[in-house]
Amino acid sequence: MRKSVKVGNVVIGGGAPVSVQSMTTTKTADVERTISQIKRLERAGCEIIRVAVQDEEDAKAIRRIKEQIEIPLVADIQFDYRLAILSIDNGADKIRINPGNMSRDRLKDVVAAAKGKGIPIRVGANVGSIKRRTSERWKDLAESALEEVRLLEKEGFYDIVVSVKSSDILETIKANEYIAEKIEYPIHLGVTEAGVSETAVVKSSIAIGHLLLKNIGDTIRVSISGDPVREVIVGKKILIALGLREGVEVIACPTCGRAEIDVENMAKMIEENFFHVQKRLKIAVMGCVVNGIGEGKDADLGVAGLRDGAVIFVKGEIKERVSKEFVLERLKHYLNELLEEVER
């Protein structure tokens, strides 16, 4: 089991549940917009939020932001050690730095500030920060991250989170497998510069999913260009699919000419309405009753289309026939019954 660190009220590592992170896209000093975006991320299920700190104005904004949010905040600093210290002084729950960009004396100052507040430091590497280059780039990536760790250890600092990220899936997997054998610190997983839409989802799901199945990884961020809320939704779905997080899983048939309902939109509507449920339940959306009920019998709850309506079934047993406009309402009714049953 990996050692644990505490980020605000969230524990990373040490057998704690894998947490879902994201990063704001706003200018941090724009406090109102940053808080608004973080609140949207909180509602989606984000558990740790990271903000970019590029100047003193950003660092000083952290205190005001923290007053209005519920989740821990991580300050991301690239070069200036003074911004790291200022972020810590203003209440950051964790900082992310690159120790290799700082002199020994300046790193000592940052470490002293972090120790004084009892907060962890995240270090690591991506392909842009590789210190040496050989024919095995994944290993260069991992060794660069380990060098960052050693710099902190030399200063007597051990509340560390480590990340190694590449835009290449195999490099990300190999590098994380390598460092998992070398250190006991918690590992932050992600695929950097993963891209947009489906490309980012596919790459992140493969790399993060593979590593989590091997029991590697303690916190995740799914990088998707655009609205960060989608990062959180996909991250939670990865954990639910792997059985690492409770929640509603919606399964749906791929549709064919027999479909009597709009399977895609129905499934999306159900996901949106039941995404908040924190119980392990499976809901099936099947286009027809020909194979639908049989294929969806493993679901806790389901709907199958009819020419003039739909049938609702619970654990493979048909409960009632309804018109299409009442499907969601009746599903909610049976879902509440299932939730009451689970609570008993």
From Swiss-Prot:
It holds the Pfam family GcpE. The keyword Oxidoreductase applies. Disulfide bonds: none annotated. InterPro entries: Dihydropteroate_synth-like_sf, IspG_bac, IspG_bac-typ, NO2/SO3_Rdtase_4Fe4S_sf. The keyword DNA repair does not apply. [4Fe-4S] cluster binds at C253, C256, C288, E295. Pathway: Isoprenoid biosynthesis; isopentenyl diphosphate biosynthesis via DXP pathway; isopentenyl diphosphate from 1-deoxy-D-xylulose 5-phosphate: step 5/6. It catalyses: (2E)-4-hydroxy-3-methylbut-2-enyl diphosphate + oxidized [flavodoxin] + H2O + 2 H(+) = 2-C-methyl-D-erythritol 2,4-cyclic diphosphate + reduced [flavodoxin]. Gene3D superfamilies: Dihydropteroate synthase-like (3.20.20.20), Sulfite Reductase Hemoprotein, domain 1 (3.30.413.10). Binds 1 [4Fe-4S] cluster. It is an enzyme of class 1 (oxidoreductase). GO terms for molecular function: 4 iron, 4 sulfur cluster binding; 4-hydroxy-3-methylbut-2-en-1-yl diphosphate synthase activity (ferredoxin); 4-hydroxy-3-methylbut-2-enyl-diphosphate synthase activity (flavodoxin); iron ion binding. Its EC number is 1.17.7.3. HAMAP family: IspG (MF_00159). Converts 2C-methyl-D-erythritol 2,4-cyclodiphosphate (ME-2,4cPP) into 1-hydroxy-2-methyl-2-(E)-butenyl 4-diphosphate. Belongs to the IspG family. This is 4-hydroxy-3-methylbut-2-en-1-yl diphosphate synthase (flavodoxin).
